[in-house]
Amino acid sequence: MKFTANSRIIAKNAVWSGVEVGFGLIANLFTSIAIARIIGRDDLGKARLGSYQYIVWLTTITLSMGTFGLPATTRKYMAEYLNKGNPEVARATYLSTLKLQTYISLIAAAIGFAVIAWLGDPGYLTASVLLVAAIVPRLIASIPSQANNASEAVRRNAAPAVAGVAVTAIVTGVSLYFGWEFVGLSLAAFLGAALECALKLRTVEKWLGHVRRGVVAPELRKRMWTYSGQSIALVLLALIVWDRSDILILKAMNPDTRQITFFSFPFSLVERVLMIPTLFGGALGFTMMAQYGRGEARLKDMTVDGGRYALMISLPLLVGMACISRPLVVLMYSASYRMMIPTLTLIALLAIPKALVTAPTMLLQTTERQGFLIFWGCVCGVVDIGLDFLLVGRHGANGAAIANGTAQGLAALGIWIYAWRADRLDLKLLDCGRIVISGAIMAAGVIAITRMAPGYLGLVLAVLGGAALWLVSLRLTAALKREDVDRFLSIGNQLPAAARPHWRNLIAWLAPSVSAS
């Protein structure tokens, strides 16, 4: 069976991204549970965790702004020129953006230190300094990371990322054991970021260091500055619409500091789970930008297929998480976090549109049509802030979840409609409907299991039963098409040799009519 080159590349990158994301998801889940149980074991601890989460979020604002401007530009134009057979210009682009990003990171850290000295809480001084210091390696690492993505070789990022997460998790565990609390957590973040940065810089030097540095032409430089500026505008809007900016209003309007913890923990957990469908969207995006350098003919089909696969991956994960939110919170975080149950349910369900928006966003960014994204982001940002003011004061974390999720849904709907009308996309809604029906069948089964079997056994049975029901539902609804079978088999070719026959049998079972023909 023949596979297209794009399918093979996307499959390979998705597998390597899966390694990175899977390791990070497991490490984050266990460390967050440990932090919640040890530091947040009483109401005072939960309040202190809320204050620390607020500081963490403030540092991520700078980090987010820095990781979407120049890094996005690096990925876009390196991919374009690498696939035009001009690696010299790609190297010049990389070195120019790396130098500028280094300056930006040092300036951002200096400003952060000044703010700490002026307005910082003395009780969190050392922790705040370490969190701000971690901005430098994180910002710098985003450039080699996107350079590797531009080359469509995500494997080069996997090992550094896993090493960084491992160091962060180990130091976090040691810190909790010795009672270093927030200083230890911040130290873990800094050490993990520093190691990941150093390793990623080394990987790029290995494959690009021998290339002669070219020249960035004035016309290209102008395009880069325009694209970078639009990317920064997009990330500012993303902080409002897609990130947890609701924390600001939550802190200002709700006197219960615990609500920040009840919002931050579920949000972080869902964000980690969202990385699973996003890893496929990311792999698709890298190939879309490379495809733009090779020719634009395939971009429309790649966009629609990317959205459908994101739905196929995200629906069971997010709906399943919402269905098991009660036993998950009570058993993993302890009964004292019961107030977090409805928040986790809301955030998980309302995050589904966020999982679907990567493909059309990448289409508009690849073709340098970010103007609508900026306009629509402004509209949705106003909606988010307005709903926050209406809901957060009275409903706390649940109000923030509703406001954030509603804005995300509106943003995703608008972006898909714009891409559909502007590019005349065939959205394949009937195929998407089959996936939604499969999700409904799975949800009904998982809810029934959690009600019949309480405790840890019920949680395990719900997860296993949900996975089985999802696969059975996909078979019953004939959700997989011929091209899906080809692509999933291509993914299977990246698995260890011993696992490949089992993968092929699973795909054949999921789509019997396609396999038979």
Regions found by a protein language model. Name each.
Residues 6-72, 109, 113, 134, ...:
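Signature of the first transmembrane helix
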Residues 12-32, 164, 188-200, 204, ...:
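Transmembrane helical elements of multi-pass membrane transporters/channels
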Residues 36-46, 125-126, 151-155, 165-198, ...:
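Membrane-interface helix-loop junctions in multi-pass transport and translocation proteins
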Residues 26, 30, 178, 239, ...:
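Transmembrane alpha-helical segments of multi-pass transport proteins
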Residues 1-30, 86-88, 95, 123-124, ...:
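N-terminal membrane topogenesis motif
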Residues 67-83, 150, 208-209, 266, ...:
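Helix-loop junctions and terminal segments of transmembrane helices
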Residues 99-244:
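Hydrophobic transmembrane helix module of multi-pass membrane transport proteins
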Residues 1-10, 182-183, 198-243, 287-301, ...:
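Interhelical loop/hinge segments that connect adjacent transmembrane helices in multipass membrane
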